[in-house]
């Protein structure tokens, strides 16, 4: 999908209450430059509601942190302030129009180590919460979250897949 057509598609997928029609829906797009990544970041920032948790998936070097930079920049955070939280595990960016919380689960040993960071406070923190390598702590994610899968297709080119995930509640035994 081209960037100009992306806004309404992402708006329909990522905003509001989850419904069953979203279960198999995937919005995909390709970007071919850092400028297009920044444009995509503006679109995504404009459609995500505060309180949204975003799972970022992709190989090393796929552009997960660069994408968070693009979204944070669209929210008014200076791009140079956004760095990978690989060694500190979480970065908080509060200088923009809304808080952005940026986790990196790559080095976490298990779910308990993630839970020690107090993610619920961030999930309910009135901003956006991005989690790189979220597949490593998937059971700790909220019931409803956005998933963005990034694949590197060239030096500055990336393929993005957007999904809305809502896990069913299990009935008590």
Walk through the language-model features, giving the residues of each.
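N-terminal pre-Walker A segment at the start of P-loop NTPase domains
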Residues: 22-40
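Short beta-strand-centered segment that lines the nucleotide-binding/catalytic pocket of NTP-utilizing
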Residues: 78-92
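Phosphate-binding P-loop
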Residues: 46-50
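Conserved lysine of the Walker
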Residues: 64
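Hydrophobic anchor at the beta1->P-loop junction of P-loop NTPases
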Residues: 54-56
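Short phosphate-coordinating micro-motif centered on Lys-Gly-acidic
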Residues: 2-27, 109-173
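P-loop (Walker A) phosphate-binding loop of NTP-binding proteins
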Residues: 59
């Amino acid at each position: 999908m081209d960037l100009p057509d992306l806004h309404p598609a992402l708006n329909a997928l990522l905003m509001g209450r989850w419904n069953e029609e979203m279960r198999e829906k995937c919005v995909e797009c390709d970007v071919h430059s850092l400028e297009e990544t920044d444009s995509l970041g503006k679109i995504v920032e404009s459609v995500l509601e505060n309180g949204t948790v975003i799972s970022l998936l992709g190989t090393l070097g796929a552009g997960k942190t660069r994408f968070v930079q693009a979204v944070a920049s669209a929210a008014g955070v200076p791009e140079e302030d956004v760095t990978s939280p690989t060694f500190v595990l979480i970065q908080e960016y509060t200088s923009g129009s809304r808080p952005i919380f940026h986790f990196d689960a790559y080095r976490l040993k298990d779910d308990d180590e993630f839970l020690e960071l107090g993610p619920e406070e961030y999930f309910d923190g009135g901003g956006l919460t991005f989690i790189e390598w979220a597949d490593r702590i998937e059971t700790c994610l909220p019931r409803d979250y956005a998933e963005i899968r990034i694949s590197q297709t060239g030096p500055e080119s990336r393929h993005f897949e957007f999904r809305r995930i809502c896990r069913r509640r299990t009935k008590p035994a």
